[in-house]
Amino acid sequence: MSERSYYDILGVSKSANDEEIKSAYRKLAIKYHPDKNKGNKESEEKFKEATEAYEILRDPKKRQAYDQFGKAGVSGGAGGFGQGAYTDFSDIFGDFGDIFGDFFGGGRSSGFGGGRRSGPQRGSDLRYNLEVSLEDAALGREYKIEIPRLESCVDCNGSGASKGSSPATCPDCGGSGQIRRTQGFFSVATTCPTCRGKGTIISNPCRSCGGQGLQEKRRTINIKIPPGVETGSRLKVSGEGEAGPNGGPHGDLYVVTHIKKHELFERQGNDLILVRKISLAQAILGAEIEVPTIDGKKAKMKIPEGTESGQVFRLKGHGMPYLGAYGKGDQHVIVKIEIPKKITRRQRELIEEFARESGENIPGSKGKIFTK
């Protein structure tokens, strides 16, 4: 597949609106349609290129993900345009009836068959946004989540027909779900109006699901969050999506993590940033202090004499773990010298003496130092 951007493939700008994208795709689809260019592999590839680009750019969520992350951001949702994708184009063109209707005589149609397949179909994938604390992202944790999803009706086993009956083959389309006809260069298939593309008709529908074969249920799932996840990490749970029509298999569930803001730590990649206050005496004389770490423990850190406010110290290996790999990032500690707002008389005298020893001239200092 071409490495060109989807915008370049369709010949539109990144700011193109829906109508411009649709119009550009319409022209390319008609020009490179395989039924019009039989045996031409180059046209076939260009047709698939254009279809892949349109499939992403016509969907606001997919387009946003593509604009932000490129093809990597939509690699799981582009419909799979690799080897063997040509035979599955009926799935894609089932959604493109509005484009081809003008050229193929109305209805949801395409040279690849248009309407829905009559046999079992794979269910839709689901997405679940999960908020995760920074501690859980560092250590890993098992979450219990509840999702609404379509499941096969238990009363009819997904057939849509009531007990004691079964779906019958549609007499008009012979079970294909499509009515075919030829127009010029194009072999056009429109959705069968009798069975609405299913290939079967149900004379006695199941009362529980209304003949759909699917019911919405709520399912509780345990999700293991591995150490090192970050905002935008996507965890795939196979077979936990929605059940497919006509007894088809379940799709997949994608859990997308969103890391909550922490009151102490700021995350930068796999490193953690912590601001730690120290006293004036500790900054001048040096000290050994304890700082919190993301695992809930304390780490000892040496403050050398003469430390300045804003100085950064590194605690190696105390950051976030690398997802799916060994090792951790570092924890960077920014020290801030805390100046007392109130001091005792004795402390004032000592500071004034310190100032004189340092050769500092502080006019009118008596009674005014550190008073606010």
UniProtKB/Swiss-Prot annotation:
Binding residue positions for Zn(2+) 1: C153, C156, C206, C209
Domain (J): residue spans on this chain: 5-70
Record's keyword terms, sorted: Chaperone, Cytoplasm, DNA replication, Metal-binding, Repeat, Stress response, Zinc, Zinc-finger
Stretches annotated zinc finger (CR-type): 140-218
Cofactor(s) it depends on: Zn(2+)
Pfam families in UniProt: DnaJ (PF00226), DnaJ_C (PF01556), DnaJ_CXXCXGXG (PF00684)
Superkingdom of this protein's organism: Bacteria
Gene3D superfamilies in UniProt: DnaJ domain (1.10.287.110), Heat shock protein DnaJ, cysteine-rich domain (2.10.230.10), Urease metallochaperone UreE, N-terminal domain (2.60.260.20)
Example of a GO biological process term: response to heat
Keyword Zinc listed: yes
Cofactor note: Binds 2 Zn(2+) ions per monomer.
GO molecular function: ATP binding; heat shock protein binding; unfolded protein binding; zinc ion binding
UniProt-annotated binding residues for Zn(2+) 2: C170, C173, C192, C195
Start-end of each CXXCXGXG motif repeat: 153-160, 170-177, 192-199, 206-213
The record's note on its domains: The J domain is necessary and sufficient to stimulate DnaK ATPase activity. Zinc center 1 plays an important role in the autonomous, DnaK-independent chaperone activity of DnaJ. Zinc center 2 is essential for interaction with DnaK and for DnaJ activity.
Subunit details: Homodimer.
Family indicated by similarity: Belongs to the DnaJ family.
Its job: Participates actively in the response to hyperosmotic and heat shock by preventing the aggregation of stress-denatured proteins and by disaggregating proteins, also in an autonomous, DnaK-independent fashion. Unfolded proteins bind initially to DnaJ; upon interaction with the DnaJ-bound protein, DnaK hydrolyzes its bound ATP, resulting in the formation of a stable complex. GrpE releases ADP from DnaK; ATP binding to DnaK triggers the release of the substrate protein, thus completing the reaction cycle.
Record protein name field: Chaperone protein DnaJ
Gene source species: Leptospira interrogans serogroup Icterohaemorrhagiae serovar Lai (strain 56601)
